[in-house]
UniProtKB/Swiss-Prot annotation:
EC number: 4.1.1.37
Name recorded for this polypeptide: Uroporphyrinogen decarboxylase
InterPro entries in the cross-refs: UROD/MetE-like_sf, Uroporphyrinogen_deCO2ase_HemE, Uroporphyrinogen_deCOase
Subunit structure: Homodimer.
Catalytic activity: uroporphyrinogen III + 4 H(+) = coproporphyrinogen III + 4 CO2
Gene Ontology CC: cytosol
Principal place of residence: cytoplasm
Database matches in HAMAP family: URO_D
Main function: Catalyzes the decarboxylation of four acetate groups of uroporphyrinogen-III to yield coproporphyrinogen-III.
Site description Transition state stabilizer, residues in chain: 77
Protein encoded by which gene: hemE
Annotated PANTHER family: METHYLTETRAHYDROFOLATE:HOMOCYSTEINE METHYLTRANSFERASE RELATED, UROPORPHYRINOGEN DECARBOXYLASE
Residues noted as binding substrate in the record, renumbered to the chain: 27-31, 77, 154, 209, 327
GO biological process, one term: protoporphyrinogen IX biosynthetic process from glutamate
Amino acid sequence: MAELKNDRYLRALLKQPVDRTPVWMMRQAGRYLPEYKATRAEAGDFMSLCKNQDLACEVTLQPLRRYDLDAAILFSDILTIPDAMGLGLYFETGEGPRFQRPTDTIDAIKKLSIPDPEDELGYVMRAVSTIRRELKGEVPLIGFSGSPWTLATYMVEGGSSKTFEKIKKMAYEEPATLHMLLDKLADSVILYLNAQVANGAQSLMIFDSWGGALSHHAYREFSLRYMQKIVDGLTRHADGRQVPVTLFTKGGGLWLESMAETGCDALGLDWTVDIGDARRRVGHKVALQGNMDPSVLYASPERIHQEVDQILSSYGEGTGHVFNLGHGIHQHVDPEHAGAFINSVHELSAKYHK
């Protein structure tokens, strides 16, 4: 493997000194880029794009050709694990992901097998190794998975949901059934993420997109408990380096202290949290990633610059901050505005690292 030329992102996650705040964007390979749209059209559909290692590599690298980013993230989907379990993932136009066979009964859950990451998910591993090779050591590669709770919401609901009625009914009516599903998913995620590291991922991120839908107590029981199991089971060293792990619960601002206790290296923050306050609460234990509202990218470059300045100022001096959005970049954002965001982080952050 090529020697890593820019390790700013990995160093910040491990709270080691950096010359400026590293920056990348969730969904940086995505529909806001015309070159992404062209490659997706070539693939035919979204999952065909994910399953073609060369095209998945191409879209992963596209934002790095445009912008001076400090990390690349594997182009894939959080629903690869349930798809590999045989649920029949498909995408409805305007509806998002759906499953032909929802997992909403104990019998369906008992029948689920844990996918072999090198077999049923081999296409993801081939993409990871291809991307790592083609990066040529320019920046680190982030691997990722959805959290067990978030994956379970899609599996039990049969797709996206605004109310989470079916899975919450299961949580309160048949908690043992839901725990069986979450346990299988946690085991699957551990294998999946460790295989990504074995194939070249240099950092890992767990996306708990729907953890914020849970109550205070239920979050600990149905989401955090299983992310803890995953953190305990992950490969944390490879290629002579630490492999940092970031947990991101959207809507999880209430639970930062509990998340920091898991032994992860960093927490992702959504835009509802003040990053300075988060640093005071948990900055002695973990690095922080975030957390500009993606909608700010609709504003003028001058306004974007101001928002970046405000977040950097709130975090303050020293390492332990990876600048990012508070969630994925929106598809209708002007790519020039994304560039203004990245350039603002470069321009404004150096003074915080003297």
